[in-house]
């Protein structure tokens, strides 16, 4: 096992070194392409452009700033020989460009010369406008390449710094674990780790059994085993326990006890919830019975009202006299002060109806509405606890 771990570490280190070398070569190639002949070419183009623009653009600008006006030299056409003034014919008209007008020249030739001069002037103007734009673009490209090369150099320095830190950490780990410990100590540590893994697997199995509820854990037996191990040094050596492992086992025992207490509390809460559900179901049944009784009373009243509606209206007074005791019997069932007031109001209305001889249908409707209101009030009352 230790040999395999050492080999794996060596492989990882070699892979890291290869990656670093590849990155460094890539950066070097990119930087070399930017900082080599390309920079020289850009500088040469800038110098040529400046030399071409100086006499036509920069020199007149400098002279204008300094306050000197450069007079243009008279241009002489080299194709034609100079003509004597006496050959021109007295005080005739002169050419606007400083040339004497020749009568022997055809007008078409004069037009062609004027067009050629205009085209040459236009081409020169375009050339003078395009060259400064080109120089500005080249300068911007040069600045961009310079800044880019500086940024890459800074990134490369950061990478080298982090790589050096990783190398130092690897060397420290080697000195801590590889240099100090020998093979025997490593084997002993591996055996102890295996023993702790076995103990953990057993504890997990016991926890699963506790959750299932089939095989509860015997904590007394675990305490006895711990005491025996503390007393017998030979048993400790055989099992390979250390102080850290003993503390770990004690912590696990405490956790098991807490788990049992939590499971008991959970069972108690379950029982309480079941009892509450039973009590709530009983209360609901009582409420349903009360509602059924009220519905039966309302159905009886509706039947009585239908029978009264079938009787003729002439016997209105007699029906009212027969209806009074039934109304009084229903209203006596009410216990609150509001119900007593309603009975008084109903009695007064009945007396008024007897005196005036009003129909009974209106009174029956009012009575049905009152019963509905009473039913709603009973439902809104708080439940008995």
Curated annotation (Swiss-Prot):
* Segments traversing the membrane: 39-59, 127-147
Q: GO CC: one term?
A: intracellular membrane-bounded organelle
Write down the membrane topology: Multi-pass membrane protein
Give the Basic residues compositional bias ranges.
375-385
| Main localisation | endoplasmic reticulum
Q: Where is this region: Sufficient for function in acetylcholine receptor folding?
A: 32-152
> One GO MF term, please?
protein folding chaperone
Q: Where is this region: Disordered?
A: 1-31, 72-105, 157-176, 269-385
Q: Name one GO biological process term.
A: protein localization to cell surface
Classify the source by domain of life: Eukaryota
The Basic and acidic residues compositionally biased stretches are 1-13, 362-374
Q: Where in the cell is it found?
A: Endoplasmic reticulum membrane
Q: Which residues form a coiled coil?
A: none
Q: Which UniProt keywords apply?
A: Endoplasmic reticulum, Membrane, Transmembrane, Transmembrane helix
Q: Where is the composition biased (Acidic residues)?
A: 163-172, 281-310, 352-361
Which family does this protein fall into? Belongs to the ric-3 family.
Chain's role: Required for maturation and cell surface expression of acetylcholine receptors.
- Quaternary data: Interacts with the deg-3/des-2 acetylcholine receptor.
Q: What PANTHER family does the record tag this protein with?
A: PROTEIN RIC-3 (PTHR21723:SF3), RESISTANCE TO INHIBITORS OF CHOLINESTERASE PROTEIN 3 RIC3 (PTHR21723)
Protein's recorded name: Resistance to inhibitors of cholinesterase protein 3
What are the top taxonomic ranks of the organism? Eukaryota, Metazoa, Ecdysozoa, Nematoda, Chromadorea
């Amino acid at each position: 096992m230790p040999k395999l771990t050492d080999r794996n570490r060596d492989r990882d280190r070699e892979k890291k070194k290869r990656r670093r070398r590849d990155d460094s070569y890539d950066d070097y190639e990119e930087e070399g392409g930017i900082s080599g002949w390309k920079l020289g070419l850009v500088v040469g183009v800038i110098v040529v452009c400046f030399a071409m623009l100086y006499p036509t653009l920069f020199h007149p600008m400098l002279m204008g700033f300094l306050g000197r006006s450069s007079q243009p030299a008279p241009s002489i056409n080299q194709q034609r020989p100079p003509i004597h003034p006496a050959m021109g014919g007295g005080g005739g008209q002169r050419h606007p460009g400083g040339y004497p007008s020749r009568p022997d020249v055809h007008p078409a030739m004069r037009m062609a010369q004027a067009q050629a001069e205009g085209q040459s002037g236009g081409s020169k103007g375009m050339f003078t406008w395009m060259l400064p734009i080109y120089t500005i673009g080249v300068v911007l490209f040069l600045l961009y390449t310079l800044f880019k090369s500086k940024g890459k150099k800074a990134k490369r320095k950061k990478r080298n710094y982090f790589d050096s830190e990783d190398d130092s950490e690897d060397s420290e780990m080697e000195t801590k674990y590889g240099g100090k410990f020998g093979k025997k100590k490593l084997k002993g540590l591996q055996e102890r780790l295996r023993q702790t893994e076995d103990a953990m697997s057993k504890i997990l199995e016991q926890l699963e059994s506790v959750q299932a509820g089939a095989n509860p854990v015997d904590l007394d037996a675990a305490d006895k085993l711990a005491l025996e191990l503390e007393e017998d040094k030979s048993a400790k050596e055989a099992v390979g326990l250390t102080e850290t492992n003993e503390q770990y086992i004690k912590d696990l025992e405490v956790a098991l006890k807490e788990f049992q207490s939590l499971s008991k509390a959970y069972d108690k809460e379950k029982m309480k919830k079941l009892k509450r559900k039973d009590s709530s179901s009983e209360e609901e049944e009582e409420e349903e019975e009360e509602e059924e009784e009220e519905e039966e009373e309302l159905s009886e009243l509706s039947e009585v009202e239908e029978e009264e509606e079938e009787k003729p209206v002439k016997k209105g007074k007699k029906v009212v006299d027969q209806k009074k005791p039934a109304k009084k019997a229903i209203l006596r069932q009410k216990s609150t002060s509001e119900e007593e007031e309603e009975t008084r109001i109903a009695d007064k209305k009945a007396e008024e109806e007897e005196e005036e001889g009003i129909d009974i249908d209106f009174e029956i409707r009012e009575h049905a509405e009152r019963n509905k209101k009473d039913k709603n009030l009973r439902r809104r009352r708080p439940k008995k606890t």
